[in-house]
Regions:
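Conserved catalytic core of nucleotide polymerization and phosphodiester-bond processing enzymes
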Residues: 1-136
Length: 136
């Protein structure tokens, strides 16, 4: 799909474009925009470059879509007034939640599981501890 269309779409419709071109029958040649590639490789048939990364871009881009959707919905639910989102690491959300705010934690967990309508259920792994250092 990336080779023919020139892009892939993530789960929520963001596009990852493949606008660079390289010689079809050579490996390791530098990729250029289409007009530049015609200048650099005038007698060679061209193909889109980097399309081998399309599947990974689809998976990681869709994961980012889901994570961002969860963050927005947790914010819109007003939960960030009660719990503290400390950081994100790839598809992970790290919170600091007081023990007396477990209801907010459970609500945010439910939002993470349902933030995107999928045919298969999303699972969420949880690790808890009294401090960041006690979490394994």
């Amino acid at each position: 799909v990336a080779s023919s269309r020139g892009y892939i779409k993530t789960l929520l419709g963001r596009k990852r474009r493949f606008n660079m071109w390289e010689p079809r029958d050579s490996w390791g040649e530098r990729a250029y925009s289409l007009s530049e590639a015609h200048s650099h490789y005038p007698k060679q048939e061209l193909k889109r470059a980097y399309t081998h990364t399309a599947m990974n871009a689809l998976i990681q881009g869709s994961s980012a879509d889901i994570t961002k959707s969860a963050m927005i919905k947790i914010y819109e639910a007003g939960l960030l007034d009660e719990i503290d989102l400390k950081l994100t690491v790839h598809d992970e959300l790290d919170f600091s939640i007081p023990w007396n705010k477990q209801k907010c934690f459970e609500e945010s967990l439910q939002i993470m599981k349902t933030c995107v309508d999928l045919k298969v259920p999303l699972t969420v792994d949880v690790e808890k501890g009294d401090s960041w250092g006690t979490i394994k």
